[in-house]
Amino acid sequence: MVSKNSWRSYVNSNVSTQQLKLDADAIKYSIEIDQNVIAKHHGISRKRIEIVAWPAVVSACCFKSNLIVHSHSKCLTNTKFDFRIMDKFNQLGGIKYGHTPGCENKLGHCAEQRAANDLLYKMRDRKRKIKDISFSKAFRPRTMKEISMCDNCCYVFDK
């Protein structure tokens, strides 16, 4: 869990209010996921929850459209990526089942890529660019450890 002192030092750094809200939203979502996983594991929840312990959670936001989307990292299933993201994937060699050169993460598996994809589909604005998307920090739901953006995501989102 994030301690009050570490959160205060983070808040006191020169971070925009919008970015703080986005990061707080990602933390809230991470805690919610972790509690659902614990409830499922211990049989507390009566409703059937198909949630697993995801390795990373992130929130993506386009401040110009006021949309915020949460997502998590997971294996590829029949996910159809937006053409803007696919163009960047193709520049990196396309979606494969192996690792891309220079990065341990597989294309399409990262929380940032999934959140951006969901956001671009919800915006339905073809003029928006990938660089307009802002991301929260990625967190591990169980430990609340902050995860840095991988090389693939840095390339795809020009960060």
Language model regions located:
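Zinc-dependent deaminase catalytic domain
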Residues: 1-159
